[in-house]
Swiss-Prot record:
It comes from Rhodococcus jostii (strain RHA1). NCBIfam families: recR. GO terms for biological process: DNA recombination; DNA repair. This is Recombination protein RecR. Belongs to the RecR family. GO terms for molecular function: DNA binding; zinc ion binding. It comes from the Bacteria. SMART domains: TOPRIM (SM00493). CDD domains: TOPRIM_recR. PANTHER family: RECOMBINATION PROTEIN RECR (PTHR30446:SF0). May play a role in DNA repair. It seems to be involved in an RecBC-independent recombinational process of DNA repair. It may act with RecF and RecO. The lineage of its organism: Bacteria, Bacillati, Actinomycetota, Actinomycetes, Mycobacteriales. Residues 79-179 form the Toprim domain. Keywords: DNA damage, DNA recombination, DNA repair, Metal-binding, Zinc, Zinc-finger.
Amino acid sequence: MYEGPVQDLIDELGKLPGVGPKSAQRIAFHLLSVEPPEIDRLKNALQRVRDGVQFCVVCGTVSDKEHCRICADPRRDRTVICVVEEPKDVQAVERTREFKGRYHVLGGALDPLSGVGPDQLRIRELLARIGNQEDGVDVSEVIIATDPNTEGEATATYLVRMLRDFPGLTVSRLASGLPMGGDLEFADELTLGRALSGRRTL
């Protein structure tokens, strides 16, 4: 163990997803070796994220405004909603350049063992968006793009059951091709784009 502030920095870095003890130590000593202005830029970026980032009131993705740039864009197709688990999944789908509709971020996936049920996700908000129309336009399709793992499949199954009550609504799921057990954010653009364009109706 290192002394005082150095060990504190390593401990805090080690709490980040995907950062183990050795990586935390390597990052900490990198930060100790850089010039003060670089540290200041990192500190300011963290401060701006803490103070200026919020969640879009419509779709739930991260934004620096009340409405994210996608929800505020009148050119996006309001009749199609792509449902994803996390804001990072929005960026994964956007990179494909295949989807021109809007998104809905659930904020996770169903995981009873971790205490995550329907009430902990933004499912009620999704149903309200469809039931109340999207800016006065009927939603015609919901694409379920949850991760291809146990929790994602359970979430997709639950959503299909909830969405069946809406007459005329098409519910689809990304086509096979994504590796089972993986995360949407790690899929390459080509594979994810093909899964999106080849989606199957449920």
